[in-house]
Amino acid sequence: MESQRTFLFIGLMLVSFLLFQEWNTDYNTPKADPSATTQTLNPTSSESEDYVPTSSDSALPASATLAKRSVIEITTDVFKVKIDTRGGDIVETYLLQYEETKGSETPYMLLGEFDGKQYFSQSGLIGLNGPDASAQGRPTYHVEQKSYTLTGDELRVPLQFTDSNGVNFTKTYVFKKGQYDVALEYTINNTTSTPLQVQLYTQVKRTVQDKGSMVDQNYLGAAYGTDDDPYEKYSFSDMADKNLNKITLGGYVAFIQHYFVSAWVPMQDQSNTLYSLITKSNAAIIGVKDEAVNIQAGSEQTLTATYYMGPKESDVLEAIHPDLDLTVDYGWLWFISQPLFVLLKWLHSILGNWGVAIIAITIIVKSLMYPLTKAQYTSMAKMRALQPKMAALKEKFGDDRQKFGQATMEMYKKEKVNPMGGCFPILLQMPIFLALFYVFLESTELRHAEFIFWLTDLSAKDPYYVLPILFGASMFITQKLQPMTVTDPMQQKMMTFMPVIFSVFFLWFPSGLVLYWLVSNLISIVQMLIIYRGMEKKGIKVRG
């Protein structure tokens, strides 16, 4: 019985430590050492602000220094976007339906320049005749107007460039109402008398980030998917160690952070090259090079790709690419987390409050696990009832551990008690707890979600630490109700401080997660009282 309590304590501590460690590992990535990365650059790559990948078929001259930006502004119902006419890159994106901070009127800035750091989405045409491979540097596009506003279901923003040979290039961004994915269309009109060869590249560039504080949920890093590996993280340190270079059918690349993702999805019916590097200016880049294409004289061809910049919503991401929803990282228990999130979302659609939905899903989960809970507490109570007999056996056999062990097992067999009966149900419940942890941590829907009174953001810690304190109190009550007696002084101290330790752990956890644990504990207390009352009616002594 003492071993069961010790096992429970160690198990909970281990799970909490692993969760806390995983949280910090995923959301706090150490800064890569620029000196360790500069040697991996291709010698033909640019040392200017722009990095243009080397074509599969030709070396690229260095591009010119980036000129002062001339931008156009695009406003939709979900975006405010700025596009640099030089290169046609997306250099700033505000998500209009998401606040920067709770209660502020400032929309969330996903892409842009902030705090001396950059986060851009870039694309262009390289190859033998690609304008981005020109010795004069990246092309400066002509635009018909400086601002565009979505008024219907679709908005097309064309950027046009004509090279010295008279070849017309039209780079068009297509925005749609209510959507965070943007279509990219490159139309090449070969007006010359000779064939052209071009190659589309798409990439995301972000300044390497410093490690945040232990409890700060910061930028994670890059990720990619191939036909063999649907989702693989590629952190700043991974980039510093080795440049990514994978050829795949289809695929995607992305930068992921807490709640949001930006990702390029190339054409899926062709072979693409995924690449990465960290530049001397400490910018991390991950991108895709499409296959080189030949455009015959007098003909026209359009190359396409899709760029997503927005919240990590599984169903939306899956519609763009079947594996892109994996950037909503539910950990190795994703197969449990995903249906739990679907259930949570359904409950919210009925109840209208995410806090109430968390309480409801807790009740459902605890009800489904009640048979395991009953088996756990029943086993503990039976072990408690055998304590006098255990003490008698210990006195009878003294230091003869072999005979004491044999006699103990015979007693268990006679009394039909499994000494591990209280531990096995705990092990079965742990995956549920872990899965729910990732649901509460990863779900964009919980960002800035209100519950009651002071709990105005279930994705953030409790500002007044009320929930962690109540959790500690509920854990203390649970200890007092459990029918176990610990005689070892060290174990007594461990049990005494366990509620305090867990309360401290939960001080910085998302309040939605702490709410789940608190409600779970309260339900466990009620279930425990019901189970023990039934056992006492049967004449089984539960508490001493």
UniProtKB/Swiss-Prot annotation:
One of its GO terms (molecular function) is membrane insertase activity. Keywords: Cell inner membrane, Cell membrane, Chaperone, Membrane, Protein transport, Transmembrane, Transmembrane helix, Transport. The gene is yidC. The chain crosses the membrane at residues 341-361, 421-441, 499-519. Gene3D superfamilies: 2.70.98.90. Its main location: membrane. NCBIfam families: PRK01318.1-1, PRK01318.1-3, yidC_nterm, yidC_oxa1_cterm. One of its GO terms (cellular component) is plasma membrane. It is found in: Cell inner membrane. This is Membrane protein insertase YidC. One of its GO terms (biological process) is protein transport. PANTHER family: CYTOCHROME C OXIDASE ASSEMBLY PROTEIN COX18, MITOCHONDRIAL (PTHR12428:SF65), OXA1 (PTHR12428). Interacts with the Sec translocase complex via SecD. Specifically interacts with transmembrane segments of nascent integral membrane proteins during membrane integration. CDD domains: 5TM_YidC_Alb3 (cd20070), EcYidC-like_peri (cd19961). Required for the insertion and/or proper folding and/or complex formation of integral membrane proteins into the membrane. Involved in integration of membrane proteins that insert both dependently and independently of the Sec translocase complex, as well as at least some lipoproteins. Aids folding of multispanning membrane proteins. The keyword Iron-sulfur does not apply. It comes from the Bacteria. It comes from Pseudoalteromonas translucida (strain TAC 125). It is a multi-pass membrane protein. Residues 35-46 have a biased composition (Polar residues).
